[in-house]
Amino acid sequence: MTEETAHRTLVAVCERVGLDPAGAELIRIGSNAVYRLAKPVIVRIGRDGETVENARRQVAVARWLASENYPATRALDVDQPVELDGHVSTLWESASEREEYAPLAQVAELIRRLHELEAPASLALPRIQPFAKLDEYLPDLERVDGADAAFMRERIEQLRSRYEALDFALKPGVIHGDANVGNVILDREGHPLLIDLDSFCTGPREWDLVQTALFFERFAWHTEEEYRQFVEVYGFDVMTWPGYPVLAEYREISMTLWLCGKAVADEGAAAEVRKRIEAIRTGGSRRDWAPF
């Protein structure tokens, strides 16, 4: 998705629901294109291939969380999702004019509260299928060096076998699916809100804890004190669970495969992919991995 195609879709979506796209700010463009309108509304334009079913589920999840008085992003009260120009778009209340991330203790509190909820059967949340996501990314390996691609394919198969043998410690249930500090922002009053509901599903709760642990332990993006507070508030340290290295490696591989999709048009991304694959191959430091 280019900025040009995203903006064209934005204009059409706004016309459909009666909003004004003038002055819209492009917040980011990646898996989705995200715009903030002059009216406090966020428009998320889905990537190629995103289904109406998945977008409907995001909106339904948001409305369920609102009914539970759970602090999460709120779906705009319009007929949505909107399917136009081959993209599925959703519209959300804008919680703030800037993206300010919540402290880790508040991230842990929202994850803990989420895990205390029981989703109604009507939501029809899917069971997490982590390797289906990796399989979607596999074609992008054709964009990297042949030896690197072969190594990553073999590593994924090894990881698949290790994952199937895991014995999870926590009771399964509803999970965010991509819980980390980047998906908990502060609203205008400084209260934390859970955002990006597109990975909501059911499954082992460890999935919602592993990224914070990974960002602390391998990337040093969080301090020891921040991680201690996270564990204290949630009540479980996923790093003490024997399966942690498997989920951590899964996340590293997923982050790297996602970046492969950008490697053709962006030499910086291509260099980062090579660096990451070498670190995975050799067990090298991840502390120089650049965020994308």
Language-model-derived ranges and their functions:
Residues 138-143, 225, 257-292:
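ATP/Mg2+ or Mg2+-diphosphate-binding catalytic cores
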Residues 7, 44-85, 97-116:
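A conserved alpha-helical element in kinase catalytic cores
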Residues 2-10, 119-177, 235:
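An alpha-helical support segment within catalytic cores of ATP-dependent transferases
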Residues 206-236, 250-265:
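Active-site activation/catalytic loop segments of kinase-like enzymes and analogous catalytic loops
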Residues 1-21, 150, 275-292:
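Regulatory N- and C-terminal appendages and interdomain linkers associated
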Residues 30-43, 75, 161-209:
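Active-site acidic catalytic loop and adjacent metal/ATP-binding pocket
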Residues 16-37:
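ATP-binding glycine-rich phosphate-binding loop
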Residues 84-92:
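A conserved loop-to-beta-strand element in the N-lobe of protein kinase catalytic cores
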